[in-house]
Amino acid sequence: MFLEEKLNLVWNKILEEVSKKISPQYYERFIDTLKLETINSEKCTIIAPSATIKTHVERKYQSIIENAILETCGDKIPVEILIETKAASPLQSILEKSFDQKDFQFNPDYTFETFIVGDCNRLAYTAAKECVRKPAEINPLYIFGSVGVGKTHLLHAIGSELTKKDPWKTVCYVDISSFMNEFRFALQSRELIESFKIKYQSYNCLIVDDIQLLSTNAEKTQDEFFALFNFLFERKRQIVIASDRPSSELAIHERLKSRFVTGVQADIQYPDREIRKGIVTHHSKIMDLGLSEDILDFLADQIEEDTRLLLGALNDIYLYKKSYSLLFLNLDKVKEIVKNRLYRKKNIEFSHDRIIEAVAKEFNLNTAEIMGKSRKKELIIPRHICFYLLHNVFNVNKSQVGRLFQTQHTTVIHGVRKTEELLSNNKEMRFLVERISSKYKLQ
């Protein structure tokens, strides 16, 4: 056992070696807070002031400390890090508990191998694979698309593959609502804010979902996320962001938007027929449903909006077969089982026609003119109003609107924006849109 009076001398020599391997900023934040408790030929015990510091040092610097001990003492001595026994505040304990949890557990079913690739999602899939192959080469990766198109699947695939590739690297998956709530909680004290910063700055990869929920009202949260983004970006840490809309449509400060466009923006469209058929075929095999080709075709043809609706239909079929101990089902029975999932689709198609007819009538046009390709001014405004009504009022996805009018997704975005500008300045047009909205939202 080393004598008590020699502990400080030995510790200072160890710290001197450690300081050669770590930047001054991190040395001051993490290493300088540690204390040497005991050291002998069997074990070196070090005290950390908090669970946050302990976890971070164990993840990032323990091997550096052990090598410094070898350099100083000539022996390879294992290091044990303990937490100082002073009473922690209840708030600090809560935050440290969240930091001390195991890394996020990614869904094992959401892998690159199980992701059905087609023209609607190929760019996002390729970019996601590249994030794993060469982290931070594409940075950030911004994936956007409507609900149920596969964004979450790709996020989990990226996280799980990065973890498999290098188990020592830490990956954080967080939805922006959780990030905002955690940050608001941390604002209660300087100590909590410091722990919050340490937590998020420690990750090698940050995956953020639902970024569209970050609004301009959350000034401090935006500032914190902006600082975190820059911190990770400058250190070439991979950042992946998912949203239901392009970054240009986010209600956030321009400086954040400008960061998001520095990498790749990958749009995932609603799955085409080929992709839908691939999804139902793949999952029906996994679930051992034994569905015939005509049933698979029916499901792929009838459920277009959302892959989750497809999977929900398969779950309905599975439960029905299990409940009645059936080996096979015919097409008529499947139609009966999933009829409630098809009802929504029929209603949406019905609304399309009614809304377009209503707009055409207001402008003394016919629907064929509005649905056509003509660029005449007297047709563009009504067409844009249709875009606006279908998307903003009746919640039809922009990709669906684009398919309905046989135009590009970006054209729909432009049309919706132009209509929003028009309505803010033109009282007559605003009344027209409100009249159509109120009439058909009640039906």
UniProtKB/Swiss-Prot annotation:
It holds the Pfam family Bac_DnaA_C. Residues 105-321 are annotated as: Domain III, AAA+ region. One of its GO terms (cellular component) is plasma membrane. It is found in: Cytoplasm. Residues 1-80 are annotated as: Domain I, interacts with DnaA modulators. Residues 80-104 are annotated as: Domain II. Residues 322-443 are annotated as: Domain IV, binds dsDNA. Keywords: ATP-binding, Cytoplasm, DNA replication, DNA-binding, Lipid-binding, Nucleotide-binding. GO terms for molecular function: ATP binding; ATP hydrolysis activity; DNA replication origin binding; lipid binding. Its main location: cytoplasm. ATP binds at G148, G150, K151, T152. The keyword Cytoplasm applies. One of its GO terms (biological process) is regulation of DNA replication. It comes from the Bacteria. Oligomerizes as a right-handed, spiral filament on DNA at oriC. NCBIfam families: DnaA (TIGR00362). Belongs to the DnaA family. Plays an essential role in the initiation and regulation of chromosomal replication. ATP-DnaA binds to the origin of replication (oriC) to initiate formation of the DNA replication initiation complex once per cell cycle. Binds the DnaA box (a 9 base pair repeat at the origin) and separates the double-stranded (ds)DNA. Forms a right-handed helical filament on oriC DNA; dsDNA binds to the exterior of the filament while single-stranded (ss)DNA is stabiized in the filament's interior. Domain I is involved in oligomerization and binding regulators, domain II is flexibile and of varying length in different bacteria, domain III forms the AAA+ region, while domain IV binds dsDNA. This is Chromosomal replication initiator protein DnaA. The gene is dnaA.
